[in-house]
Amino acid sequence: MVSPENTNWLSDYPLIEGAFSDQNPTFPWQIDGSATVSVEVDGFLCDADVIKEPSSRKRIKTESCTGSNSKACREKQRRDRLNDKFTELSSVLEPGRTPKTDKVAIINDAIRMVNQARDEAQKLKDLNSSLQEKIKELKDEKNELRDEKQKLKVEKERIDQQLKAIKTQPQPQPCFLPNPQTLSQAQAPGSKLVPFTTYPGFAMWQFMPPAAVDTSQDHVLRPPVA
C-alpha cells in the first residue's frame, strides 16, 4: 500500500535506479515519480468522482421517483375514497340493488332524487299553509258560535223570567155571559127589536147572592123613615 504522504516513493530506492541504468545504458530511463504518481492518483481520483457521480445521479433519480410514487399513491387513495363515496351514494339511492359504477348515472339519480324531494317539500309546505288557514277559519267560526250560544242563553233566561212573572200575577175571575141562543129565544117573535150580535167576553160584575137580594126582613133591619 502506498501512503498518500509520500507520492515520490520510487526515488527512495537508488539501487533499482542504478540497475536499470547499467543494464540499458543506451536507453535513458528517467523516473519522474511525482508526475507518474500524480497522474495515477489524479486518475484514481477522477475515476472515483466518475464512480460517485452515477451513484449520486441514481440516488437523485430514485428520490424523485419516490416522491412521484408517493404523489401517485395519494392520488390513488383519493380516487379510491371518491369511488367509495359514489358506491355509498348509489346504495343509498337504490337500496337492495347492486351499486352502480357509472358516476354520471349516479349523479343524475342523485339530482333527480333531490328535485323530487324538493317538490314534495314544497307541496307539503303549501298543504301546511292551507291547513293553517282552515284552522284559523274554524277558530273564528267557533268563536262566533260561542257568542251566538251565549246570546241564546241570555234570551232564554229572559223569556223564563217573563213566564215566571206572568204565572205569579193574579188571574181575574171568569164572568158569566148568557148564551146568544137563549137571548134570541127570550125575545118575542113579533117584536120589532133587532137582535144584537154578541161581543167577545169581557170582565163584568158578578151576580149578588140570594141572601143579599132577600127583602123580607127589610122592615126589621131597616125601619121606614118617618
Curated annotation (Swiss-Prot):
- Any Pfam family matching the protein: HLH
GO terms for MF: DNA binding; DNA-binding transcription factor activity; protein dimerization activity
Subcellular localization: Nucleus
GO cellular component annotations, sorted alphabetically? nucleus
Q: Which InterPro entries match?
A: bHLH_dom (IPR011598), HLH_DNA-bd_sf (IPR036638), ILR3-like (IPR044818)
Q: Which residues form the bHLH domain?
A: 66-117
Name any Gene Ontology BP term.
intracellular iron ion homeostasis
**Disulfide bonding pattern of the chain:** none
Query: What are the alphabetically sorted keywords of the record?
Result: DNA-binding, Nucleus, Transcription, Transcription regulation
Specify the domain of life of the species encoding this protein: Eukaryota
Cite the record's note on assembly. Homodimer. Interacts with BTS and BHLH47/PYE.
**Which protein, by its recorded name, is this?**
Transcription factor bHLH115
Q: Which organism is it from?
A: Arabidopsis thaliana
Which gene is the coding source of this polypeptide chain? BHLH115
